[in-house]
Amino acid sequence: MSNKAEKYSQLRSMIPEMRRVKHIYFVGIGGAGMGGIAEVLVNEGYKLSGSDIAESAVTQRLAQLGATIYIGHDASQVKGMDVVVVSTAISADNPELVAAKELRIPVVRRAEMLAELMRYRHGVAVAGTHGKTTTTSLIASIYGEAERDPTFVIGGLLNSAGTNARLGHSRYLIAEADESDASFLHLQPMVSVVTNIEADHMDTYEGDLEKLKTTFVDFLHNLPFYGVAVVCIDDPIVRELIPRIGRRIVTYGFSDDADVQALDFKQTGYSCEFTVKRAGLADLRLSVNLPGEHNVLNALAAIAVATEDDIEDAAIIKALAEFQGIGRRFQQIGEFATSKGEIKLVDDYGHHPSEVAATIKAARLGWPERRLVMIYQPHRYSRTRDLYEDFVEVLSQVDCLLMLDVYAAGEAPIPGADSRALCRSIRVRGQVEPVFVASTEQLETILPEILQGGDLLLTQGAGSIGLLSRSLTESNLGFAATGKDEKNA
């Protein structure tokens, strides 16, 4: 164990029973959520190993920190482990999972390990269908600016830290709470945030929206009676659930009855300016270095959490104004000089209709003079099926649409819930003429024909499209070399 890890091994001192655990194995270690927890544990001084199907920036970073990384899953790799951590993406027949059970090695889900990290810390858990990563990142940034030195585990790359996880040396732990498999019920934080609730991951909830709602209420009731629930009152389902929440509540939003309210919103390019009204406190006029009303809501959640913890306004204002963003959350890749003129490239992770709509609205507000060209990759056949008409409506709002095939994420195809079907339905709607693109390689031929000078090109989705911005950068958006002028934001 390094001197740093020995000095600050808080988990072992807080949970003596964890001293028995020497070697931890992660199956699917390259995922953002898994990799973040793994990074905190390896920095705590635990011996750590893990596997994934491919090398990634996450696995490379963990290897540099001292973890043993295997590419590919093999039963022999879990021998001698004290505990095996698995993500929900790991199938029951995974050879490492099967071997762990045969060897009677404890198998825990990612959220259970996160719960152990949080057990004796002051935990802030951020849940909701949309906005978790951004909100968690904003809270972590404010606490960092206030010199609270938090530990954080985030589902995306926090640009200012160069990582999605960090071991702090204080009592604070700030983390995303994942409702996709209801595993957030393992967490027992001091502060819980709910950004919004929509029908998503409905297979977990047997297609029952009421079951989803009840699970969120149960999550909030994991708070101690002296904890606080910070919830977005603008969201209709959250507002509906407030009478069922038996904990102290702080609401936020644009609504007049919000405890922490945003007023006088204005977006200029990438940043938003607004006034924050809080009961019994002076109003704040501030800006957040993120676009869109949805990001103002995310900022309000962070402000509410920080205000509850008596963080000074100066730290809040500075952290939000200087926020450097998160990977793949309206990430400005650059501006490119082409034979057609300058074109701006933005990459975004949103893959639910509401997220896509918020991204489109932010782009329209920030750059109203630009034509909006979207390359979209649907994520999961089941989501496409369940939200089909919503996708048709929101994707019809761009000026030009290029549609990649569905990223299956392990699912079998569902007839009528694929990209070709979406293109047909969008075409019938008549607002935009979509172009189906069978492979990303075709984009180098298609883009120079479609793009115009001044366009905003948006790559959108949660699957393999996340790698597209790099290849587009290398090929200058498919144009022949014309003096690329990349300005990373």
UniProtKB/Swiss-Prot annotation:
GO biological process: cell division; cell wall organization; peptidoglycan biosynthetic process; regulation of cell shape
UniProt EC number: 6.3.2.8
Covalent S-S links between cysteines: none
Pathway per the UniProt entry: Cell wall biogenesis; peptidoglycan biosynthesis
Record field: catalytic activity: UDP-N-acetyl-alpha-D-muramate + L-alanine + ATP = UDP-N-acetyl-alpha-D-muramoyl-L-alanine + ADP + phosphate + H(+)
Highest taxon listed in the record's lineage: Bacteria
Protein localization: Cytoplasm
Functional note: Cell wall formation.
Protein family according to the UniProt entry: Belongs to the MurCDEF family.
Protein name as catalogued: UDP-N-acetylmuramate--L-alanine ligase
Species this protein is from: Shewanella halifaxensis (strain HAW-EB4)
Gene name of this polypeptide: murC
